[in-house]
Curated annotation (Swiss-Prot):
A motif (PP-loop motif) lies at residues 49-54. This is tRNA-cytidine(32) 2-sulfurtransferase. The gene is ttcA. GO terms for cellular component: cytoplasm. Belongs to the TtcA family. The thiolation reaction likely consists of two steps: a first activation step by ATP to form an adenylated intermediate of the target base of tRNA, and a second nucleophilic substitution step of the sulfur (S) atom supplied by the hydrosulfide attached to the Fe-S cluster. GO terms for molecular function: 4 iron, 4 sulfur cluster binding; ATP binding; magnesium ion binding; sulfurtransferase activity; tRNA binding. The lineage of its organism: Bacteria, Bacillati, Cyanobacteriota, Cyanophyceae, Acaryochloridales. Gene3D superfamilies: HUPs (3.40.50.620).
Length: 283
């Protein structure tokens, strides 16, 4: 079969990897430029959990570091939360092979969460809050200027709909976030990257994946329902998720209803009509 008519899945794995790697590098590079995620002299603390997303994040950032016109440091950090059967040597062995500076932080948050959360309830919320506090502390100790997390496009869209359906607010995950105490800058370089591309990349790179269910907890039913809904939409209408994500970059405050963000109270009719002004009244 001629290469001209070969699909991506029919390409040799090495060619698939190169093509996918170039795509992911391009998307990460665009996010970095669009949001000024990485600057000269930055010390980036890459949070590495052992899942496909954080492995991909570290891998792509290391490639970009070698090619970037600016100098920045990378420090990989893993939080060992003392979950049962956690394979403690997997990440150190992997990082030693890469010769990447890293730090393993041991904090028994698992026992704390098990003590506080009733049996059968999801532990993810409390676990996430404890983990965030520890990572902020470590970032300060390591003098990291940015904290890089592995959230991808679908994570951001799912969070948007979770907040829309269950919290009554339009809020997602920004590619760049200043912590509440204004001491830490969180970045999400994979913000433009589709989850399917990351999964395929992780498979081709054969990362030593550590299961995320060692603690026995699962995603909340709400998140599972939103994920399934979005997957069904994408299957029915390919490209819909990308359209939804683009909407987060194309906000029209005057077409929403938040009086704190748009001054509806002082809207006034102009003495002279504006030329070529679109009418969005919906009448």
């Amino acid at each position: 079969m001629s290469n001209l008519f070969m699909t991506a899945t029919q390409l040799h794995p090495s060619k698939q990897l190169k093509k996918l790697q170039a795509r992911l590098r391009g998307l990460v590079g665009k996010a970095i430029r669009d949001y000024n995620l990485i600057e000269a002299g930055d010390r980036i603390m890459v949070c590495l959990s052992g899942g496909k997303d954080s492995y991909t994040l570290l891998d792509i950032l290391l490639h970009l570091q070698r090619a970037a016109p600016i100098d920045f440091e990378i420090l990989a950090v893993n939080l060992d939360q003392k979950q049962p059967n956690f394979p403690e040597q997997v990440l150190p062995n992997y990082l030693n092979q890469l010769q990447v500076p890293y730090r393993i932080v041991e904090e028994d948050t698992y026992s704390t969460v098990k003590r506080v959360i009733p049996e059968g309830k999801t532990m993810c919320g409390l676990c996430s809050r404890l983990r965030r506090g520890i990572l902020y502390r470590v970032a300060q100790e390591e003098q990291a200027t940015k904290i890089a997390l592995g959230h991808h496009r679908e994570d951001i869209i799912e969070t948007l709909f979770l907040n829309l359906f269950h919290a009554g607010k339009l809020e997602a995950m920004p590619p760049k976030l200043l912590s509440d105490n204004r001491q830490h800058m969180v970045i999400r370089p994979l913000a433009y990257c589709p989850e399917a591309d990351i999964q395929r990349y992780a498979d081709l790179r054969q990362f030593p994946i550590i299961p995320c269910t060692l603690c026995g907890s699962q995603e909340t039913l709400q998140r599972v329902q939103v994920k399934q809904m979005l997957q069904a939409w994408e299957q029915e209408t390919p490209g819909r998720l990308e359209t939804i994500f683009r909407s987060l970059q194309n906000i029209e405050l005057s077409q929403l209803a938040d009086p704190q963000l748009f001054d509806f109270a002082h809207l006034a009719i102009a003495a002279t009509p504006y030329a070529d002004s679109p009418d969005r009244s919906g009448l």
